[in-house]
């Protein structure tokens, strides 16, 4: 088999995989066919999600249940500028709740969240899980009737029951209805080998103020294994966000500040690197253009282009049709 023929086969496989991923971007609940949001569509800002703090005198099972129910509001702050879900936790567990960094488990909204008491002030929570979203945003559908469970310790804080999370931390449990409100599918883009085209990898991220940061962080990661040999990234290995935030100014310019390295400053990498970031970050609501800076140096220019670029065509790139 010639190299060109092998390349065509690999590219065809990528197209099939991408198409399958695009087709699987909803969580099935019935046999009805419903119109849904397309992957990569610019999603309107979500409505604010309001949840209640713990009620005085609530028993352990109610505290555990209401903590899980507070999960969809993990990006919201109350009047005291604190995330309400944290008020269900014992002080030593606040930093163990990492909804942005650990696995999100999606459970069937038609099934019950089962909570059973255990000895030594503990409760076990069990759900019928339908999918997981890992820390990189990859969605994995689970076999039917998959059960997921965890154990929370319970302790009294100022006379009220509060949760002691597992030592390895806890992410999110969201029912299917809340998942649809909080998460959306996006494309993280990579450069097709020897071409000025980008191919997407589908990820799921929370829709909210930190979406540009989540998309940028995902773009910095290595190329997924299934795209190996077909696509590459122009972003040097080991490059990170210099600050854990991608601010968006009032004109819609998202500024990405990267850690310094010789490869990051390589002029041959700038156009494809910029193309990847533009294609990925412009999916975030309000982002119209992208500027790239290097820590300690400032904006990295590309010949004949402005400091902030808004179009792939300005860079000579395009998206692979899916």
Annotate the PLM regions:
Residues 19, 26-322:
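Bimodal "functional hotspot" detector
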Residues 2-28:
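Secretory targeting and sorting signals
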